[in-house]
Amino acid sequence: MTVALPRTPSPLVRYIYVGRVETMSSKKLTVDAELEKLQQESFNYFLHETNPANGLVIDKTEADWPASIAATGLALASYPVAVERGFMPRAAAVERALTTLRFFWNSPQGPEPDTTGYHGFYYHFLDMQTGRRAWKCELSTVDSAFLLAGALTAGVYFAAHTPDEHEIRMLADALYRRADWQWTQDGGATVTHGWKSESGFLKYRWGGYDEALLLYILGLGSPTHPLPEESYAAWTSTYHWEHCYGQEYLYAGPLFTHQLSHVWIDFRGIQDSYMRDKGIDYFENSRRATYAQQLYAIDNPLKFEGYGRHCWGITASDGPGPDTIKVNGIERQFFNYVGRGVPYGPDDGTIAPWAAAASLPFAPEIVLPALDYCIHQAKLTELNSYGFKASFNPTYPGIFRDAHGWVSPWHYGLNQGPIILMIENYRTGLLWQLMRNCPYIASGLRRAGFAGGWL
């Protein structure tokens, strides 16, 4: 495929054609080296923001914050990348993975309010030290899916005939088999969002296209407590096909919903019944959603500062709010952490650079210039130990501003993981290759009606 170059190609894009680049900081780096630097900086979060005693990863870098089970699952999936890239010795990665899996296998499960989980699923947030439920939060089905996907990744990758790596494989398998997916349906056709010990199942169910694609594949693939095949059909019956900004695609507003399942599953060339009817696959769908994001930023219907061809990425992220103020005569509402989306909002001018990075496999021709902008013009990795900060907002006039506006003071584990893993899928397809070798993924895909391609 021939990609039309912009008149003044960014340093990252220019390398694709001429072999080496000179960036704005006058450092000569290949695209590969620049991407690897971003991967390593992002991985440093998991290296330094994990409790080595239990493997739990802090949700964000704010003091006294709890662990996120989704971030912990992304860390488990990132350890193979770290070994392959030389970010971490294999022995250290084995120790981290084994510590994490032992913790979850041995942690208390039950209906009591201060456990770690129930029915093989886990509370969304856990105390970093004790591993018990934090904030009276919900037991989260989708965040448990990210945790279990990470465990399965470790189980496939650590395949050496050593006692520790054998135990990793056994624990990953046991944790996955323990999850009672049928329980999460609460008698309904689809899966609930979660459960609380005080009040039972949450009233919300997974409906409409979103990151639950991974959840359903894992649930369908279970050899012990599988979801019925009808549950997947019930979920896809809630899909909404949309036409916006010249793109026809299966709609979901926040960009992360088009990315997170693709961290683990290579959807290129495989289709379920819904996608067969549309004549595309989920990978192509994510490419179109990525282009819709860029085109929305170019159009910039709400006239926010900074939006443009190389400045986009609207997703669930930190923000400068909650606040409502007048900016240049226009009353603007700003949010804190919320699931921002395109084109129907919410949108308050907040850009998340990790969202662009996680679309790299789908549309490198527009993602690489966006990364170049974030690194070399907005300088969102400068003076940061962990690569990109969570988000920035050029429109917001409050504190924590620099030349490019408000910048989040935090890093989030849920942002760091997709940067590492989707860059790696773009570079080598490592996660996709690993999970092709996971029989539960293949079984779940087939039971969902997927066929074709590598499957």
Model-derived features: positions:
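Ser/Thr/Asn(+Pro)-rich, low-complexity disordered segments
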Residues: 22-455
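Short, solvent-exposed loop/turn segments at the edges of extracellular beta-sandwich modules
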Residues: 1-8
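Short beta-strand edge segments in extracellular beta-sheet folds
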Residues: 15-21
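Extracellular and select intracellular beta-sandwich modules with Ser/Thr-enriched
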Residues: 8-14
